[in-house]
Amino acid sequence: MAKRGGFPGGMPGNMNNLMKQAQRMQRQMEEQQAELENKEFSATAGGGVVEVTVTGKREVSKVKIDPEAVDPDDVEMLEDLIVAATNEALRKCEEESQAQMAKITGGLGGLGGGLF
């Protein structure tokens, strides 16, 4: 007699294959995430006077500012350039992450409630 909520004799063949495929996909995703975390993404703003670098962990690792961009009378402009460069670097990181996940999932964007 089957256990309540289970299948007689264990999982059907297709379900077993599906589980193996899901486990393989999970391993690949973990490997890709580890690779991504070791990468850096840089972006510039203001014609290159501000450069921001973020890691695959989405942490700012470096900010370079050309001294000519520092105007004590216009600090707001420098702040805007830093924000713009940071957002662009984060966008590059996100694009790379999505591209890697698409390779693994084969474009199953809705799988898992949109986790990918």
Swiss-Prot record:
Compartment annotation: Cytoplasm, Nucleoid
Point to the regions of Gly residues compositional bias.
Answer: 1-12
Q: Where is this region: Disordered?
A: 1-42
Locate the compositionally biased regions of type Low complexity: 13-26
Any Pfam family: YbaB_DNA_bd
Taxonomic lineage of this organism? Bacteria, Bacillati, Bacillota, Clostridia, Lachnospirales
Q: Which residues form a coiled coil?
A: none
Q: How does it assemble?
A: Homodimer.
Q: What is this protein called?
A: Nucleoid-associated protein EUBELI_02017
Question: Could you tell me the keywords of this UniProt record?
Answer: Cytoplasm, DNA-binding
Q: Which Gene3D superfamilies match?
A: Nucleoid-associated protein YbaB-like domain
Question: Would I find Ribosomal protein among this entry's keywords?
Answer: no
Question: What are the GO cellular component annotations?
Answer: bacterial nucleoid; cytosol
General function of this protein: Binds to DNA and alters its conformation. May be involved in regulation of gene expression, nucleoid organization and DNA protection.
Q: Which family does it belong to?
A: Belongs to the YbaB/EbfC family.
> What's a single GO MF annotation on this record?
DNA binding
